[in-house]
Amino acid sequence: MGLFSSINVASTGLTAQRLRIDVISNNIANVSTSRTPDGGPYRRQRIIFAPRVNNPYWKGPFIPDYLDNGIGQGVRVASIEKDKSPLKLKYDPAHPDSISSGDKKGYVELPNVNLVEEMVDMISASRAYEANSTVINSSKSMFRSALAILQG
C-alpha cells in the first residue's frame, strides 16, 4: 500500500459513480422513447461494478483462497447491461409506433424506465460520489498535517 492509495481508491469510486450518474441521466432522458435505431423501445441500462484487486505478495500455495481476498484497489465498471424486465404497454392507437396487429393491437411499447427508481438511484450515486470526495479531502488534510509535523 502506497502513500496515496486512499486517494487512488476513492478516485476509482468517483469515476464509477460519475459513470453511474451518466447512465441514470440517459435512462431519465429516454423515459418516453418508443423507438430507437434498433427498432424497439429504449431499454433501461444499469451498471455492474466489480472490485479492482491485485494478488497480494503473501499469496502462496498453502493459503486457502477463502482466507485471501487480495489487496483492494477500488472499484471498476465491469459492464453496462440492458435491463431485461418487461416493457410497459400503453393503449394509444393514434401513436405512430403502436402495434398494428395481434392481441396487442393499438398498444405502444414504452421503455421499462421507472422515473422514481431512477431518481432514487441518482440520489444514491450522488451520495456515494460525495462520500468518495470526502475521503479524498480527508486524505489531503492528513497529508498536510503529516507534513506540518515533519517540518516541525
From Swiss-Prot:
GO terms for biological process: bacterial-type flagellum-dependent swarming motility. GO terms for cellular component: bacterial-type flagellum basal body, rod. The keyword Transmembrane helix does not apply. It comes from the Bacteria. The keyword ATP-binding does not apply. It is found in: Bacterial flagellum basal body. Keywords: Bacterial flagellum. InterPro entries: Flag_bb_rod_N (IPR001444), Flagellar_basal_body_rod_CS (IPR019776), Flg_bb/hook_C_dom (IPR010930), FlgC (IPR006299). Belongs to the flagella basal body rod proteins family. The basal body constitutes a major portion of the flagellar organelle and consists of four rings (L,P,S, and M) mounted on a central rod. The rod consists of about 26 subunits of FlgG in the distal portion, and FlgB, FlgC and FlgF are thought to build up the proximal portion of the rod with about 6 subunits each. This is Flagellar basal-body rod protein FlgC. The gene is flgC.
